[in-house]
């Protein structure tokens, strides 16, 4: 269940009580299933929902002018993506599944409701985003200053930390 995966993920960032758990478990959304190697989002696409990953892996990436891809991050169970739909409707990146993926598609209005119902949840989601930004800063250093071996090692350690 996507809601349980989300609870596991955000529980790392805040001490949630039973009421917070209930708010998460009552999120209204539509189940979504995508096969392996499926483009879920194309850059420039109009966005209409936040997706919570239940099972599977995906990559968020940007396509460079010469056709190469720059992977921005890996999306794992419990991750949410496309929170920018809360303030902007067009995606500035693409998302493609690495494995088959199951998720929960949540309308922006429903996600805003969730944020207004619990200060702890708002803090947990904010802290989750702060951690993602920290990961992206590390990626900038990794790509700019580390050798290929160091980049791969750091990336694998980051994945290991997130999968646990």
Regions found by a protein language model. Give the residues of each.
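A generic structural signal for short hydrophobic patches within well-formed alpha-helices
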Residues: 80, 111-112
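Residue-level recognition of specific faces of alpha-helices
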Residues: 23, 49, 71-74, 94, ...
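Cyclic nucleotide-binding regulatory module and flanking cytosolic helices
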Residues: 1-36, 80-81, 86
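Conserved active-site beta-strand element of glycosyltransferases/polysaccharide synthases
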Residues: 104
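Polybasic "coupling" helices that flank or enter modular domains
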Residues: 116-164
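Cyclic nucleotide-binding regulatory domains
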Residues: 12, 38-100
């Amino acid at each position: 269940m996507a809601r349980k995966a989300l609870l596991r993920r955000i529980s790392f960032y805040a001490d949630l009580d039973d009421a917070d758990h209930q708010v998460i478990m009552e999120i209204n959304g539509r189940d979504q299933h995508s096969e392996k190697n499926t483009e879920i989002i194309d850059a420039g696409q109009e966005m209409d929902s936040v997706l919570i990953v239940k099972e599977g892996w995906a990559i968020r990436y940007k396509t460079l002018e010469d056709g190469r891809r720059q992977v921005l991050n890996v999306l794992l169970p419990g991750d949410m993506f496309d929170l920018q739909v809360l303030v902007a409707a067009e995606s500035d990146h693409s998302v493609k599944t690495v494995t088959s993926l199951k998720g929960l598609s949540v309308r922006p209005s429903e996600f805003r409701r969730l944020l207004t119902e619990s200060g702890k949840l708002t803090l947990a989601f904010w802290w989750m985003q702060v951690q993602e930004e920290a990961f992206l800063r590390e990626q900038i250093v990794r790509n700019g200053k580390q050798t290929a071996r160091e980049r791969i090692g750091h990336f694998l350690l980051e994945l290991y930390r997130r999968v646990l």
